[in-house]
């Protein structure tokens, strides 16, 4: 019982400490993650944080390939730009080549109603400004009832569960982390559309350290470099 109460207390303390703005990441300029499938490195995910006065652009690049016996079975490449002005979301755009299938999403803010305007390959329309782009670097995602696919604009309603405190070892470094599970709140979704991902954030900095999920294999994102 004491452990349960402690876990709940830690979770709410985490929520209270979440900065309402992305200024929390003002000391981060670059994040790079190693992407693994079944414990084999297959690619990377890189973020660059570019600042100009009160403007922040977060540029992302993801690339991976799956091969067997020297034959390429699957390839994926995506680029995106996430823009903030004075700490608030302003605009997002991405293009993705998913095994030779093109996907995209553009998101802006309605200047009057402040809703998010989504133009994507899977969804077009307005949605709540309480939703967040599904880019895991921003720890505010743990507070949100839904995330917007950074690939296609699909609205993914989610449940977030605090799993507990864990030590995560990557290479020679050990991180003290808070582990969360993200799952789809819509039970009617097909298996390939359901969200079920574990995310680890560093306890004191809220930096994204690791992600893991099962989908035709065991996938992991592991922090490789931060500067």
Predicted regions: what they are:
Residues 94-134:
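Hydrophobic, well-structured mid-protein blocks that either form specific transmembrane helices
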Residues 6-7, 206:
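General alpha-helical segment detector with a strong preference for membrane-spanning helices
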Residues 7-15:
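Bacterial N-terminal signal peptides
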Residues 21-110, 139-227:
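Acidic, serine/threonine-rich low-complexity disordered tracts
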Residues 15, 126-127, 190:
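Alpha-helical interaction segments
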Residues 1-4:
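Positively charged n-region of N-terminal signal peptides that target proteins for export
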């Amino acid at each position: 019982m004491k452990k349960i109460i402690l876990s709940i207390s830690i979770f709410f303390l985490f929520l209270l400490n979440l900065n309402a703005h992305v200024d929390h990441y003002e000391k981060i300029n670059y994040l790079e993650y190693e992407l693994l499938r079944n414990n084999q490195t297959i690619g990377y995910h890189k973020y660059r944080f570019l600042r100009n006065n009160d403007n922040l652009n977060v540029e992302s690049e993801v690339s991976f390939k799956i091969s067997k016996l020297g034959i390429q079975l699957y390839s994926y490449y995506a680029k995106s730009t996430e823009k903030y002005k004075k700490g608030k979301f302003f605009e997002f755009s991405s293009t993705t080549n998913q095994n030779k299938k093109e996907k995209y999403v553009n998101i802006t803010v309605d200047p009057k109603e402040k809703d998010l305007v989504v133009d994507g390959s899977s969804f077009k329309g307005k949605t709540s400004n309480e939703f967040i782009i599904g880019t895991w670097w921003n720890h505010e995602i743990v507070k949100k009832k839904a995330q917007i696919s950074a690939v296609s604009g699909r609205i993914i309603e989610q449940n977030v569960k605090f799993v507990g405190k864990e030590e995560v070892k990557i290479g020679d470094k050990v991180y003290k982390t808070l582990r969360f599970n993200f799952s789809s709140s819509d039970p009617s979704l097909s298996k390939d559309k359901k969200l079920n991902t574990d995310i680890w954030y560093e306890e004191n900095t809220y930096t994204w350290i690791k992600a893991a999920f099962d989908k035709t294999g065991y996938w992991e994102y592991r922090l490789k470099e931060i500067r």
